[in-house]
Amino acid sequence: MRKAFYTWLMAQRHSTSNKPAALLADLVFEDTTFPKHTDDFETISRYLEEEASFAFNLGQFDQIWEDYLSH
């Protein structure tokens, strides 16, 4: 079983990085309603599109997701 996307994403946090995964990780870290226990693309993508309290380039999310799948 794959680890939750949130768990993987938190390992990408780097306060001095401008990489999209690090930026998303910082935003998600501050978001208390982010779905933390799932590895489902649709659930996370829908959350980012419709419910997140922050804006993020969803084109970059697709590449971050590919990186997550290849870890």
Swiss-Prot record:
Domain of life: Bacteria
Coiled-coil ranges per UniProt: none
Gene3D superfamilies assigned to the protein according to its UniProt record, in alphabetical order: YozE SAM-like (1.10.150.260)
InterPro entries: UPF0346, YozE_SAM-like, YozE_SAM-like_sf
Family note: Belongs to the UPF0346 family.
Protein name, UniProt field: UPF0346 protein Sez_1447
Annotated organism of origin: Streptococcus equi subsp. zooepidemicus (strain MGCS10565)
